[in-house]
Amino acid sequence: MIQKNWQTLEKPSKLDITPGSDPKREATIVAGPLERGFGLTLGNAIRRVLLSSLQGAAVTSIHIDGVLHEFSSIPGVREDVTDIVLNIKAMALKMGAEGPRRMRLRAEGPCEVTAGMIETGADIEVLDPGHVICTLDSGARLNMELTVAMGKGYVPASQNRPEDAPIGLIPVDAIFSPVRKVAYKVENTRVGQTTDYDKLLLNVETNGAVSPEDAVAIAARILQDQLQMFINFEEPQAAVAETKADEIPFNKNLLRKVDELELSVRSANCLKNDNIVYIGDLVQKTEAEMLRTPNFGRKSLNEIKEVLAQMGLHLGMEIPNWPPENIEDLAKRLEEPY
């Protein structure tokens, strides 16, 4: 019965994703309930992988006509070459090819040179076209070639200089990671009457080359691949079949009765009078519907919203195929000892 070591652990049935101000770049991803201690274990591991191991595109070197090294200045260009290199490092790129690719930037002043003015190939996308690279005065010209490559993590400029580098090639510190920021915290959440389960909240910000939820999925897959080598056994086929037969197609909390919620007498009576038996019945109600319930006020509404939030649920949810025909049997299976 070795499979009981992982089958009996509490785990979330799905992730709750809340987009940030820029949905393509920012999101808060909530996973719960988790066994006590697993929030910290998973949060720290996922954060480290997100920041260090995801593949991305970055400029690895540049060549500017008339410039021999990065400590030069260009006539008519307000920024010196060092500042231009720093601005190029901060560009966000997305590339669909493996090998190095070259881009070209041509500009004539007076103008503000932005990333959107770069001539890219079909397999390179500039994700922040408004990003400023430099400013040209009247009569100034800029002709630059940029080399883009795929990689992971941070690679210093010294490693981006080819052995046969031509005179004037300026290597650039490459920040390949598409993930800009990751922060996590662990909160308590409740399952039934037990309140010391973990809830993991991941705040992820990317440069737009990959969405936050996809970045977390890739990080989890990397961890899965790395951990696979430590498993020195195969799960018995009977155990696999038993697991599939025992699967409950809903969040387990939805199958619990509202009687298990620690609500005030008024709130509990209102739910009972409205024939709300299971938490799955409750979460499909909207706030407006709840407030139309006799004797149910704003205080009771806030109380229920807080209790549901602790389980990663909320009012107004859409639950396909609810209620299941065998809801009583499914609910009883939750009460059965392992």
From Swiss-Prot:
- InterPro entries given for it? DNA-dir_RNA_pol_insert, DNA-dir_RNA_pol_RpoA/D/Rpb3, DNA-dir_RpoA, RBP11-like, RNAP_asu_C, RNApol_insert_sf
Annotated spans, Alpha N-terminal domain (alpha-NTD): 1-234
Gene Ontology biological process: DNA-templated transcription
Entry's free-text remark on domains: The N-terminal domain is essential for RNAP assembly and basal transcription, whereas the C-terminal domain is involved in interaction with transcriptional regulators and with upstream promoter elements.
Its biological purpose: DNA-dependent RNA polymerase catalyzes the transcription of DNA into RNA using the four ribonucleoside triphosphates as substrates.
Q: Which UniProt keywords apply?
A: DNA-directed RNA polymerase, Nucleotidyltransferase, Transcription, Transferase
Chain spans, region Disordered: 1-24
- This one is known as DNA-directed RNA polymerase subunit alpha
The text of the family note is:
Belongs to the RNA polymerase alpha chain family.
* Biased composition, class Polar residues, residue ranges: 1-10
- Native source organism of the sequence: Rhodospirillum centenum (strain ATCC 51521 / SW)
Where is the organism placed in the taxonomic lineage, from the top?
A: Bacteria, Pseudomonadati, Pseudomonadota, Alphaproteobacteria, Rhodospirillales
What is this enzyme's catalytic activity, as reactions?
RNA(n) + a ribonucleoside 5'-triphosphate = RNA(n+1) + diphosphate
Subunit structure, interactors included: Homodimer. The RNAP catalytic core consists of 2 alpha, 1 beta, 1 beta' and 1 omega subunit. When a sigma factor is associated with the core the holoenzyme is formed, which can initiate transcription.
What one GO molecular function would you report for this record?
Answer: protein dimerization activity
- Using the UniProt annotation, give all residue ranges assigned to the region (Alpha C-terminal domain (alpha-CTD)): 250-338
- Keyword Cell inner membrane in the entry? The reply is no
